[in-house]
Structures are given as C-alpha cells and as structure tokens.
Design a protein with these regions (language model features):
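Hydrophobic alpha-helical membrane segments
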Residues: 7-14, 18, 25, 46, ...
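Alpha-helical protein-protein interaction scaffolds
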Residues: 1-89
Length: 187
C-alpha cells in the first residue's frame, strides 16, 4: 500500500479535526490536531486549532496556535497584548463529579453551579416529599409512605443529581463559548 505524503496527511488530519469539532467532539478533534502538529508544526488553520484547544481547556496549546496565527497575519503589538491579557483570565472548568457529590444533599449541586432558584426548589421539593414520607411512616401507614414518598423521592432526588451534572456541562460550554467569542472579537 502506498504511503500518504506528510502534507496530504496533515490536510487529512485537519479535515478530521474539523469534522469532529463540528460534530461536538472537541477532544477527538484535539487529538487529530496533535497528530497533525507532530508531522508538521506549521500546518493548518491556527485560529480554528486555537478554538478547538480552548474548548478542551488546553489553553497553553490554544495560545501557542493563536500567536502563530497572529504572526502569519502580521498583527500589531496591541493585538498580541490583548490576546495575552485574555489568556490570563481563562475560564475555570467546573467538575461534573463535584456537582454529583455535592448533590447528595438536594440542591447543593445546583448551588455549586450558581443555579440558586433551581437549588432552592430542589431542596424544598425533596424536603416536602421526605416530610410526607416520615409523617406517613410515623402513623404506621407504610404503604402510603412508600407510594406517596418513596417513589416520588426516587424521581426528585435522582433528577436533581442528574440536573446538577447537566448544569455543569451547560456552564462549562457557555463559559468557553464566551471566551472563544472574546478571542475572535479581538482579531
């Protein structure tokens, strides 16, 4: 089988990176970019590469690519400073596992994400269901406690846990999108 020349291989890897990025899989896109840069350090669209690396929270690689982009476009010193200042304030990634652990206490995982109203609602809703179940169990109405509290609590409690994780993903996506938008607006 004939081997592909390095230049064509780099182009193919960049196309795969773009396809993965458009499909929402930035980690795979970054892997293809790493492979392309290993073959040819000057290959590809540096702006797109920077945005992909930023989405993976690999800000050092993103800054390296954007500096290379600025060099090739002949940017002035002010743009370099603006980009460097932006990269000094990179967004912090919130951890899904932290939100899940914190949501053991209903609502706290929501508070971690800044969703105060949702957290208070989750805490109140779970509290009402637990109180109802405890009152039914105290009155020795166990079937009523299980049906009236146990089953709904399964949905409200587990739903709160999964919602806390969803909020982390939404928040991370929003913060990195805002960061990339600021970067593009500087160029």
């Amino acid at each position: 089988m004939r081997s592909i020349p390095a230049e064509e291989r780099c182009a193919l890897l960049h196309e795969k990176a773009l396809a993965n990025h458009l499909a929402g899989n930035s980690e795979s896109a970054a892997t293809y970019l790493d492979e392309a840069f290993a073959l040819d350090s000057l290959s590809g669209n540096m702006l797109l590469s920077s945005l992909i690396y930023n989405e993976c929270y690999r800000f050092d690689d993103g800054l390296r690519c954007i500096r290379r982009h600025l060099r090739t476009t002949g940017a002035d010193a002010r743009r370099y400073r603006d980009v460097a200042n932006l990269y000094e304030k990179t967004p912090r990634r919130h951890n899904e596992n932290t939100a899940l652990v914190l949501s053991i206490i209903p609502g706290v995982g929501h508070f971690y994400n800044g969703a105060w109203e949702e957290g208070a609602l989750s805490l109140a809703l779970n509290g009402i269901v637990i109180t109802f179940g405890a009152a039914q169990a105290a009155g020795k109405m166990f079937v009523s406690a299980i049906l009236g509290a146990g089953i709904p609590l399964t949905y409200t409690y587990m739903g709160g846990n999964s919602r806390a994780v969803e909020l982390v993903e939404e928040r991370n996506t929003a913060k990195i999108s805002e960061f990339n938008f600021k970067l593009i607006s500087l160029l």
